[in-house]
Amino acid sequence: MIRLWIHRVKDVMAVSLLFAAVCSLLGVVGVTTLELPVGENVGQWIWLGKSTLFSAACIIITCLLQLVKRDSLKKVMCFFHFSVYVSWSLVLWGSVEAVWGLRQLYGFSASGHSRYALTGSFFNPGPYAGYLAMVLPVCLHLYLRARKERFVRYKIEKVVVAVAGILILCVLPATMSRSAWVAAAVGCGWVAYMHRDKSKWNVLWKRYKRRFILWGVSALFILMLGGAGAFLLKPDSALGRLFLWKITCRAVVNYPSGCDKGFAFAYGEAQEDYFVRGDYEEWEERVAGSPEYVFNEYLSLALTEGVVVCIIVLVAIGTCLWMGAKRGRYGICGAILSLLIFSFSSYPMYFPAFVVAGILLLLACGVGDFIYKPLILCICLILWIGGYTEKWKQEEDACRKWVYAKMFYNSGAYKVANKSYGEIYPVLKEKGAFLFEYGHSLYKSGFYNESNKYLKEACLYSTDPMVLNIIGKNYQELHRY
């Protein structure tokens, strides 16, 4: 009896440690660094490095427990039911984000952006909505699966995921993110379709075929009206993204194997060439800007890494989806579909939270059951031995000093700001906003040649036309027309 009790305690400990190993990685979504410049994610990367070490420690302890229990080598090395751990970790963090958003809506918590009331742990409501949309299909899958079971455990699961889903649905409409709404609808639609009773649907189809066709046509008409309404909700925003994709496609044609100088350089070059030709519409001139992101991860990948790499990644994702569907992991596949749809008109891969979630979801389709334990140990070794954590720490310290230097810059103490900017330049020399501030501060101080040096570097990382304006002013002051 005592041996059985000890055995169960070890099982509970192993399950808890494995859940902590997965949950800690996905916990990067809850990390906020308000002391850093807006939009900087280096604090989340540092957390990821620490959580990877914690995850590796949990896995090692679990393996030792399993060896003590004399489990088979296969059970020790494999991570069985990996998809379950990922699903419940996503439900947990999705619920935390939903509650976070509700607190912001009711004024109990501060938003991450002064212009928006609802951002969750993000600095923009768009990515926040995308994260909630990714979690919602997982909640629906767990609910539909638990609905068919009569055990008390499944009844508790059904209540928990129902509460999580309701919390997300309370917040998601308030984000005003059309991309996230569509992503959530597609992901949940996939899950509901895969959970259908095939025999019952076949009988109903044969009996009410005409009625179903009529309903389908009506639903299509409603979707078209909804699409038109979504467009009219923020028309310039939609037109702006269409123009952004158009110019990015032209840039991809110019750099089919990828542009090593980055998105900003390739996009700025393509947009300049487009307007120089003069063959453009009035609305294109109105919505054109200097974007920081492509708002389409597929075009972004094709532009920066090449079309071939983009195709390889899409094939790999499609293979994982096929494996997940074959294994009945509909919630995981639904979450991936939501992320894929959201990636079509947003920039989720800019955030560590989406990068980690995307990788874990792909692994949860089947491969993770066999390779996750050695994989996380290898990643831990790469991060710590390769010095990535130290690099991220240096960047975080530099960003803190940047905030300090920005105070002098905004107050007009340019000489003091120049000294601070010069100290952190080696670490932040690939950030367009930093280079522009440094160059502009040098311009205000009268160092025109030095200013142009850094502003020309900024052109590689920023499409902001003000960079070129200041370069022109520098040449004007130097009497070089």
Language-model features and meaning:
Residues 124, 241, 351:
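Short, conserved phosphate/pyrophosphate- and ester-handling motifs at nucleotide-, phospho-/glycolipid
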Residues 36-47, 124, 248, 294-296:
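Membrane-interface coil-to-helix junctions
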Residues 128-129, 183, 264, 292-300, ...:
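Membrane-embedded glycan transfer/ligation machinery
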Residues 170-176, 180, 184, 188-253, ...:
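A membrane-periplasm/extracellular boundary helix in multi-pass inner-membrane enzymes
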Residues 1-92, 142-162, 192, 196-214, ...:
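Transmembrane signal-anchor hairpin modules in multi-pass inner-membrane enzymes, especially those
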Residues 265, 334-339, 375-380:
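Central hydrophobic cores of alpha-helical transmembrane segments
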Residues 2, 11-31, 46-68, 78-114, ...:
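Alpha-helical transmembrane segments of multi-pass inner-membrane proteins
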Residues 109-116, 250, 260-303:
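Interfacial juxtamembrane loops and adjacent helix segments
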